[in-house]
């Protein structure tokens, strides 16, 4: 192992001891923001330090086995132990390399999920509803909370556009590679001839912005319009201008929220979504530049890129970025996404390791 890597691991082991001491301090419990920040840091440090401890322990076992070589009666056993220890050290070094890769500071955040119907008309809108259900089921399986922020329903079901907030630790890190064009191939319910139609939806996964630090929005850059909400809403609908449309003049980004009966809450929601979109815009510009430099397959930030096809007749899902095909369409649509998200994360880590090798 390189001395620079060893030094970094020793620093992290020492930092874990410091964090544990700070968490045990009664003052930390009185400051919930500080306590949460330290708890999150500890959760990030612990797997690295545990792997490092295992690495050091295996190195000690190797040294002991090498000393045993001098004893003729113990030589055969020592050689076996040396072989096993060296193999274990190689595995642990690989794990530690991955654990030390630069972390996306947004990985631990909650996210905004935006799904828009694209080509395919009503069938595309129906598929956007299927995608929302898929991600909602996955979020539930992870213990995350899903809240609809804004929706534009289609007459036949599904959505022309829907924005949801998924609230949970690590939500963005797990779902960030879902951004892009999702294509569906199936026979629509309205198709009398049984012909397969192709339609598509665009998915955007945006990390929730930290209002204090991430994005500064100048009120002078905003045009805020209020209007009467449309759609289902019972006796209160169309009686007050509760719906809000916010336009960010420098970028032309527009956010509408009308799902709540309170204008104030609709404005708050619209501002949250706008902040996330502005943060996402910055991220995508940076990712696009990095992807061009590294020829990255995953995480390029290109929303127009067709990333996945859901083929109903064949019961398959294909992710085109990593050439992965799974014949478990129904399970995936029910929220069983771990195999997909895990493969995408592994590919991203492989790209990072390759880039690290180029930089050394």
UniProtKB/Swiss-Prot annotation:
Entry's Gene Ontology molecular function annotations: translation release factor activity, codon specific
Organism: Bordetella avium (strain 197N)
Chain residue ranges for the region called Disordered: 284-303
Chain's gene name: prfA
PTM note: Methylated by PrmC. Methylation increases the termination efficiency of RF1.
Family: Belongs to the prokaryotic/mitochondrial release factor family.
Pfam families (alphabetical): PCRF, RF-1
Main location: cytoplasm
Residues with the N5-methylglutamine modification: 235
GO CC term, one of those recorded: cytoplasm
InterPro entries: PCRF (IPR005139), Pep_chain_release_fac_I (IPR000352), Pep_chain_release_fac_I_sf (IPR045853), Prokaryotic/Mito_RF (IPR050057), RF-1 (IPR004373)
Keyword Cytoplasm listed: yes
Protein name: Peptide chain release factor 1
